[in-house]
């Protein structure tokens, strides 16, 4: 059975200040060994306090998710541009007797339209994953044998005892999974469930023993396009490939990458890493190793200037027996797009994944049609929602107007300089060259530089 008694708020001992956390503790007996109880903790400090439990449950999953590690969640809560730190973080802990068997890192947030209606604002509150964006399929943490009952216990608690929300949403969920099924099973007269379309994730299963073997698995047309553009690139000047791994080595290239972002097609769009100072700080902490990911960087230089770069994160250190890599951010110089530096980056990323024995290389979301050419298979997902029938979210979901207007407003704000010209001037080139030189001056471990001769050996095609 599932125990769901009312709760009271108790401060967490030893925690104070702006990151003060609270525990919602159950009153009464927890019941016999077969009963499940759901408790909740609030605040950023709770992520630190319960870090060992969060990470233990993550490793118990079929596929450990670095975006659900305690380090990533804490970094997201403190640095993400989307939310204010210390507001709305809420971690639900599911126990069987005294044993913790499940965890759901979540947050409460108010939609913009909810702020316009005064005392009815609570009807516009959304309860969602703590880190819903810039992640891979966020959800609950539990061992495979516990997933169904943990999901059921969580949904029962949220529907019966967690007050003041209009929509419960889990983004990026595969249909048919335990969490997805539990949300739909909770639908009744008070709540309705729906699947909202979402862009698929794309992922390469790393099954090749070498970069050459992978390259040969691509279509003849794809191989021809990649090799032809690479030869054009190498004919344009002095090309050098950069491979960096580890916090210090990748950090040395971060400012160069941010400058490159301003010379890419992303300049002035919502896709730019520089669209918000908090976003820059968020990724700076990721590459510095502060988010639980092992940072990696792949770069292409032409005549002493970085013209393409890819930031990668892996979970090899946290999960040495079952690890993969995720492409986090990528950019290339738009003025040199005809040389195909972006294509070369993706090829090199697959090669690095093979070298490191990753089980998969994830390209995240968007542009699935293009990523499929690289043997990346789509992972179809939906944003599964449970909507309180008497809520602003329900009205918005039926009408669809408020959300579209708000989304368009956000895009307008983020893309005011969408027409900005990313074509570099002579001064831009000089600045880029200086930043690249500063990165090259890093003399610590973790960096490989391949000149033309080494590239002839490394690449699976003729570059001359």
Task: Describe the residue ranges of each PLM region.
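Active-site/acyl-donor-binding loops of N-acyltransferases
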Residues: 2-40, 177-213, 217, 318, ...
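A conserved beta-strand-loop-helix scaffold within acyl/acetyltransferase catalytic domains
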Residues: 38-123, 170-201, 209-337, 462
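A short, internal acetyl-CoA/4′-phosphopantetheine-binding micro-motif in the GNAT/acyltransferase core
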Residues: 135-147, 330-338
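Conserved acetyl-CoA-binding loop-helix of GNAT-fold acetyltransferases
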Residues: 146-157, 338-350
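ATP-hydrolysis module of ASCE/P-loop NTPase motor domains
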Residues: 148, 159-177
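Hydrophobic pocket-lining residues that define ligand/cofactor binding sites across diverse proteins
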Residues: 158, 162, 290, 353
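Conserved GNAT acetyl-CoA-binding A-motif
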Residues: 164-172, 353-364
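Hydrophobic, well-ordered secondary-structure elements that form the walls
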Residues: 304, 342, 346-349, 353, ...
